[in-house]
Regions:
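Alpha-carbonic anhydrase
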Residues: 3-5, 21-258
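Sec-dependent N-terminal signal peptides
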Residues: 5-14
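C-terminal motif of bacterial Sec signal peptides marking the signal peptidase cleavage site
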Residues: 16-19
Length: 258
């Protein structure tokens, strides 16, 4: 493993990241490049994001994420989620807001006739979405892109239970301070997905600045497990990196059962 102290602000992922870590492009709003934001700061916390710079105007929009999922409309016409994840090495970054795993090209998510490329996945503690007003201790987001204005993010909840073997591998490589390094060990991401892929679906946004409203959200109904020790280990590195619940503002939450 080789450390690369190359810092990238996680907030700007919405604008453009290519699916290959060797050709990764990040487009940052020019007036927001050096803007610092936090989850709970009195000057740069969540309620101030929209005012930190003009490029963050979507943070005050009407289709923001996360939401509390309370009731949904079954929709039999919704296409299922077809995951085609390859074994991959990852570039791992602790950017102070989350721990992000940028994946090699080759892993895809197909929804109907559209195929999205997996860009990266990252963690939030506690979960960002709620289900019937209840939080989970962890939520992982798999970020996929079809175009700069068309993202599909799959949210997966962790619940306390049996030890998760794949999560143990990730924990062993979590950077405890800001920085980026490459993990050359190939991993199969299928271990971070439940067997049953039933989901909730709604239209929303990125949950961090610039809060771009370009995301098709698919929150899986079924959780994966991690031991209490594993969850505590993650929280010892990074916790409370979650956005508050946003208003639904007339949006409809659909669901599909497998």
């Amino acid at each position: 493993m080789k450390y690369h102290y190359f810092l990238i602000t996680f907030a700007v992922i919405a604008f453009s990241i290519s699916s290959c870590k060797n050709d990764k492009k990040v487009i940052i709003p020019t007036d927001c490049t050096d803007v610092h934001w936090s989850y709970d700061g009195s000057i740069d916390g969540q309620d101030k994001w929209v005012d930190l710079c003009t490029g963050y105007s979507d943070c005050g929009g009407q289709s923001q994420s996360p939401i509390n999922i309370s009731g949904s409309i079954p929709n039999l016409t919704l296409p299922g989620l077809d995951f085609n994840y390859s074994s991959t090495t990852t570039e791992i970054e602790n950017n102070g807001h989350t721990i992000e795993f940028v994946c090699e090209a080759g892993s895809e998510l197909t929804i109907g006739t559209k195929t999205y490329q997996l860009l990266q996945f990252h963690y939030h503690a506690k979960s960002e979405h709620q289900v019937d007003g209840t939080y989970y201790p962890l939520e992982v987001h798999f970020v996929h892109r079809a175009s700069d204005t068309d993202y599909a993010v799959v949210g997966v909840f962790f619940e306390p239970g049996e030890e998760n073997e794949l999560f143990t591998e990730f924990l062993a490589h979590f950077p405890t301070e800001k920085g980026t390094f490459t993990d050359t060990t190939e991993i199969n991401l299928s271990g971070l997905l439940p067997e049953n892929k039933s989901f909730y679906h709604y239209s929303g946004s990125l949950t961090t600045p610039p809060c771009s409203e370009v995301v098709n959200w698919y929150v899986l109904k079924n959780e994966i497990s991690a031991s209490a020790t594993q969850i505590a280990q993650f929280e010892g590195i990074l916790k409370n990196n979650y956005r508050d619940i946003m208003n639904l503002n007339g949006r409809t939450v659909y669901s599909r059962d497998e």
